[in-house]
Regions:
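Intrinsically disordered/low-complexity terminal segments and short unstructured peptides
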Residues: 16, 136-138, 152, 309, ...
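Extracellular beta-rich repeat passengers
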Residues: 23-62, 72-84, 91-92, 96-198, ...
Length: 535
């Protein structure tokens, strides 16, 4: 398979104007300490989180689409939205907001900085109604004796969180994105967490709903739910690197009612539909994976997590129903697995329990549940799910995942978009991760633009192409701050011009997108050069 990758070289030429080039610019502003009044972060600057940055009520932090925010490594830079404060991170498909490592391309690693924490006033199942977020930040979450399940902590939309997640001690970690007691008035959609040093996403109680989530090459669990979380989740993807797993065991889903498995109310009962969880094993004979990989879903400690219309494949064990409380929830039908596919499970039948007298495999295969199980991941018929730099988890023609979904269950409320397919992606519609997700953040050079000297700031951006690497075509987008004659050319590594994609007069203030077909090129690295001459 040929693989073509772009590195973006931005050259901006305005006749009769003096320019400062800010490609790969250093940090423009350091954010630290407490934020007690409203702040606005502009995409014309790069920001650095230093230490634990607390946004306190009634402040709102608003982040412009396209903004790049680094987390400082030595100080464990972390953004914390405390109860009563808000974050408005409303990116776009063309201009996602990116929280990432400050380290150079090629030298980034899980745990390079802390992560993003949002604390709300919704219900949790801890006595007294409040608790402290793990990870050493001291953040309090939950609404106490007067919780508000409709609490609004703001918006995360088209946001990437890359190389976060610090494990201070076992069970005391900052995850990529922590949502503690967050209410359903909050908007969470189109969020990718990549290379998290601990869990990618973790919900500590609360009622917040979310759609379009990606966990990419995380270290520990992909989606962790506990302390009475009762939100609805739809359309999620997890892709695992076979070499990266946590010493304590890595799972796709991990869920607890609380830390000791009490029956405290409300019980942890997230309703999950249309997730695709891709484990480390491309087939059951594959042995070159980290031995700390465990289960596609580990339901334990009295949780009642329920999964519908989803795919879990490529794990040593597919599903573990752990403990008597989980067993009785399963047999009592408060814990449900319905209309889902499990495949490519290495050990035994892949569906298991530690409870004598309970046959988890028979329970899973109850005909009315509509579940299916396949020996090999390939039988699910996804196009290229184990491609680690450009995964394609879309069902191919005649895939069994193209049909079999059901939304007749009363738990699948109007929040859920009804589909006929199971898993995260439609076989017939455009992928929802296109244009904003990044499956190679290790090699991405973040560019904020070029600034004209003087008091007026003008921005000129060439965005990272998607997909990258690509075969045979990719999309290239750019933003202009001035009207002018604009050219976009492609060069090889020797500097020879390969192709002119654009040579036209264009207007400022628009995002332009071009498609580059590289089917006639050999594998290698190519450069996109964008120039403009002011008219």
């Amino acid at each position: 398979m040929r693989s073509i990758k772009f590195l973006l070289f931005v050259i901006f030429q305005i006749i009769y104007s003096s320019l400062v080039f800010a490609q790969l610019a250093p940090v423009d502003s350091v954010i630290e300490g407490n934020i007690n009044s409203n702040v606005y972060l502009s995409s014309t600057k790069k920001y650095l989180l230093r230490g634990f940055v607390n946004v306190n009520p009634p402040a709102t932090i608003t982040i412009e689409p396209g903004t790049i925010i680094y987390g400082e490594k030595d100080s464990k830079g972390t953004l914390i939205i405390n109860r009563g404060a808000k974050i408005i991170a409303n990116g776009t498909r063309q201009r996602p907001i990116v929280f990432t490592s400050q380290q150079p391309a090629g030298q980034r690693a899980p745990g390079d900085w802390g992560g993003v924490i949002i604390a709300g006033n919704a219900t949790i199942n801890v006595p007294g109604g409040t608790a402290t977020i793990e990870g050493g930040t001291g953040t309090i979450y939950g609404g106490g004796s007067n919780p508000n399940d409709n609490d609004n902590s703001g918006i995360l939309r088209y946001v990437r969180i890359e190389f976060p997640g610090i494990a201070f001690l076992p069970d005391n970690e900052i995850n990529g994105l922590i949502l503690g007691g967050v209410g359903r008035g909050t908007t969470i959609e189109y969020v990718q967490v990549s290379y998290s040093g601990d869990d990618s996403f973790e919900w500590f109680g609360g009622t917040v709903n979310a759609k379009y989530l990606i966990s990419y090459k995380g270290v520990d669990d992909d989606f962790d739910t506990d302390f009475g979380f009762r939100g609805n989740l739809q359309f999620g993807l997890a892709v695992r690197d076979p070499n990266i797993a946590d010493i304590g065991g890595s799972n796709g889903f991990e869920t607890d009612n609380d830390g000791t498995g009490t029956y405290n109310s409300p019980r942890t009962l997230p309703v999950i539909s249309n997730f695709t969880i891709i484990g480390p094993m491309r087939d059951t004979s594959f042995t070159q994976y980290n031995p700390n990989f465990r289960r596609g879903a580990h339901i334990r400690r009295a949780s009642q997590l329920s999964i519908y219309n989803s795919i879990v494949m490529g794990f040593p064990v597919g599903l573990l129903l752990d403990g008597s409380a989980v067993r009785y929830s399963a047999t009592g039908d408060t814990l449900q697995i319905r209309n889902s596919i499990w495949a490519g499970l290495r050990y035994g039948n892949g569906i298991t329990t530690n409870q004598q007298g309970f046959n988890a495999e028979e329970w899973f295969n109850t005909p009315s549940f509509g579940n299916r199980k396949y020996v090999q991941p390939s039988e699910v018929g996804l196009i290229d799910p184990f491609n680690l730099t450009n995964p394609n988890p879309v069902p191919a023609a005649n895939s069994p995942a193209a049909t079999g979904a059901s939304f007749s269950n009363p738990r699948l409320s109007s929040f859920f978009t009804q589909t006929t397919y199971v898993g995260a992606f439609s076989p017939n519609e455009p992928r929802w991760d296109e244009g904003w997700a990044n499956y190679d953040p290790q090699n991405t050079n973040y560019i904020t633009g070029v600034y004209e000297e003087g008091t007026t700031i003008k921005k000129f951006e060439l965005y990272q192409n998607y997909p990258n690497p690509f075969n045979p075509s990719t999309s290239i987008s750019f933003l202009l701050a001035e009207n002018g004659r604009t050219t976009l050319k492609i060069y090889n590594v020797l500097g020879a011009e390969i192709k002119t994609l654009l040579d036209s007069d264009l207007e400022a203030g628009k995002i332009y997108t071009l498609t580059f077909d590289g089917s006639d090129l050999s594998s290698g690295i190519y450069y996109a050069e964008l120039k403009q001459a002011q008219i």
